[in-house]
């Protein structure tokens, strides 16, 4: 029997390659979409769940029968941030269903104790905190929720996302961003690889091309 994973944000920039990558690795997928026609995926291994990520019944339906959760939920920088609200609901539902593995993404500008960022990356993080203070505060709250959750979580910090670039070598670092951009394909590949990789459980690695 195939392991089944739930995907939130699977039609966005970072997530649109996730479902196909997961199927190639032998997983079955349950993917949340607001509008099913937005997804052009046509695969018997992919089940589309229509709904809103803020709705508890939708999240319960999405996660039922799953072994792990991948969250790439995204929204415009100027929108009222919902990251922590949705992550809190996902965590609660995962606990109810006894799902342990969670893999998510956040911005590389999120500072964490122990970071050893270059001067340029430090300046970039400061600029983001000034320009998008509400969003960055919500992303920090999201991290704190995961840290307190007792789940096997990994929160991957990303640079600028390039949608149409080909797959390249993925650079990884625990303490600083190793590049300025990454392709959507490589984000998907790295996230799928983490489902059974314990190396980054409870950690916030940086990745880039």
Could you tell me what each predicted segment is?
Residues 47-66:
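Conserved Rossmann-fold cofactor-binding substructure of NAD(P)-dependent oxidoreductases
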Residues 149, 165-170, 194-203:
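Glycine/proline-rich active-site loop of Rossmann-fold NAD(P)-dependent oxidoreductases
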Residues 5-25:
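N-terminal Rossmann NAD(P)H-binding glycine-rich loop of SDR-like oxidoreductase domains
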Residues 32-37, 52-53:
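N-terminal Rossmann-fold cofactor-binding loop
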Residues 67-70, 103:
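N-terminal Rossmann-like NAD(P) cofactor-binding module of classical short-chain dehydrogenase/reductase
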Residues 82, 156, 180-192, 203:
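Substrate-positioning beta->alpha
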